[in-house]
Amino acid sequence: MKLIRMNKVSLIFFFIVSSIISQNNTEVYLFDITKTTDGYELNNKLNISNNEGYDNQPHFYDNNTLLFASSRDGQTDIVKYTIDTGEKKFINYTKNGGEYSPQRIPNSKDISAVRLDNSGLQRLYKYNINSGVSEEIIPNLKVAYPLWYNDHVLFSAVIGENALELVKSDLNNNSNNILEKNIGRSLHKIPNTNLISFISKK
């Protein structure tokens, strides 16, 4: 899995390394990428998760802060990593479940994450990045992979009866509309357009 953020000539690069033996042992690495005459060069490899177990789904909160899901004590919580200091801090501790897919909510300091409770209940929550206090964003929708389009509209891969469904949610009017059935996990905004991309499995 790759997550790239451009910054003029140089950029920061994430690479998730999975163990050949166990897919649950993953790490999040940080690189400097320098543009050269032949292309790009990776330098200064740094394992920023450095944790046994599941570490995945990195997301830039801002130019100096990264979010990712990381396992501890048998569950998965949200980590905030500060680039210039190397500080790593868990922002929440959910006793009855775990979090995945952390993202910053546009025009907000809060973040969202998918919470999977031990009971099997799966929902999208909002978290205060400092206190970790959370609240449910979309009731009764089993969000698996969210994509924020703006601060009140998001597209999600939602778990349906037999496959993932592409759902558009508008928080201003509490609407959820199924746009496509049988899609993949990958949702992205297309740069410099008003479009998003998704994988259709039809």
Functional labels for PLM-detected ranges:
Residues S22-K202:
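Sequence signature of WD/YWTD-type beta-propeller architectures
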